[in-house]
Amino acid sequence: MDKEKEQDSLLDIKVGISLGDINGIGPEVVLKSLMDNRILQGCTPIVYGSVKTLNTIRKSIEGEEIFFNSCKDATEARRKKINVVQVWDEEPEIEYGKANETGGKYSFLSLEAATKDLAANKIDVLVTAPISKETIAKAGFQFPGHTEYLADLAGQKEALMMMVAENLRVALVTSHVALADVSKSLTREGILDKIEVLNQSLQRDFGIQRPRIAVLGFNPHAGENGKMGQEESETITPAINMAKGKDIIVNGPFPADGFFGSVALHQYDAILAMYHDQGLTPFKALAFDEGVNFTAGLPIVRTSPDH
């Protein structure tokens, strides 16, 4: 395939973008990304929101002028244009940095419209900007986060939150769960399901034929043979052994505190952490500027900025 045909093929990819909270960082990040001309060479972007709202926010940030192609529907999107599906016509009041009902309402409207088009195959990929979980819930959003919402829409029980950088992939067994509830959320079957989803995603989405997966423990020092907790011996290790019985290359549980500073980090294709901060704190320390949040286990591609 020559370069011209390759670029032509890339432009066939319609990337839907939900704005996130209009009072937050989401629209700014979206607009600054769209100012990079490479975007229009690699896909056809479709933002779900309003030209008026985007122009208002555009005035508050530095950078080149942006010209939008207003669409009633994603099918009207044009190549080499920054397309905006008009989800609303009114001009909501924007209060930067404030978590309020307005931000929640319009973040949900944008997300609903984008996911509706995704389900109808009008877009090929979904990129979601950050939401305020507190305010979007007041607008009727009944899920802990994007990952759970998209899994429900796709009818997938075991979607997996995974942070991805060039040389680092970290997935989570539990994601938006209170720390006090993590232990009782861990089951052998649940951990096994997450290992299987991660293994399949590494094969299908990342082209790794025989992935190597490291699983972290839950307690300090991975339980120290039961002296600091039973989760490793009663739940995590049995799940790992069950996965090995399914011909998955997986090892652990490794003590989480030292793993990310050890040689072992580079011997695996992905790490499976037990809970949100256990996996995301070291990931963001090592790869915050390049990290992407990828939802594994879905029949579609969904990403968001590391945040």
Regions found by a protein language model. Give the residues of each.
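Contiguous, glycine/small-aliphatic-enriched amphipathic segments in soluble metabolic enzymes
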Residues: D2-H146, E189-M274, Q278-V292, A296-H307
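A generic local secondary-structure boundary/capping motif
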Residues: D73, A151, A159-M162, Q203-D205
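Short, flexible loop segments at boundaries between secondary-structure elements
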Residues: D152-L168, L298-H307
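Ligand-binding beta-strand-loop-alpha-helix segment within the catalytic cores
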Residues: M163-L192
